[in-house]
From Swiss-Prot:
It holds the Pfam family CcmB. The keyword tRNA processing does not apply. GO terms for molecular function: heme transmembrane transporter activity. GO terms for biological process: cytochrome complex assembly. It comes from Rickettsia prowazekii (strain Madrid E). Keywords: Cell membrane, Membrane, Transmembrane, Transmembrane helix. This is Uncharacterized protein RP268. Belongs to the CcmB/CycW/HelB family.
Amino acid sequence: MNNLFVLIKREFILQHRINNIIKYIVIFFLFYIISTVLINSEKDINKFGLIFSVICLLISLISFSTIIFKSDVEDGSLELLLSIVSCEKIIFAKFVAIFICTTVGLIFVLPVIYVFFDQILLEIALFFISVWMIFVLSSSLVVLSGSVQCYFKKNTNFVGTFIMPLLIPNIIMTGLILQDNNLQLIFIMIGINLIFLPVSFCLSAYLIKNIYNIT
């Protein structure tokens, strides 16, 4: 348990200070907010602003799939970690760190959404819950994508583009939740996560375990 906590702490520092996930998500989203406010009418912003915010946040996260394991491989720390702890712990720590970073970034942008999109607190709460659920799945898929690119090493830049189609069902659910306040759809999102998460973890762990042919 102590090893896992240390791993999570290490990964959080890595993703926050080196990869700057939190800062990038906030800046990317602020750019989106400014562009949306300048280009669209107030009616369009109130109608489509939240759902476009979901897509914007996901795009900003998916872009990190190419560098998730980059520093670990380049400095040899991944090989060292594999000789000390299990690949499952490495993958779980990576997932938790990314998920925490994205959640913190989401919390930072909520006040901006509240001010610029003129939403009531209930809509903001539904937005947070639904996006938080999507971040659970997207964080695991980003780790999986990074594992694939780390394992094959060449001609894998396209892998990140396959993440978004897997998130489309949850994006649709989020749109319906925000439009109709249908909280029951959250349980469907939970079910989708429970299906994809174990598969994503198992595949990621397998790829990382065999990257140096360590058994």
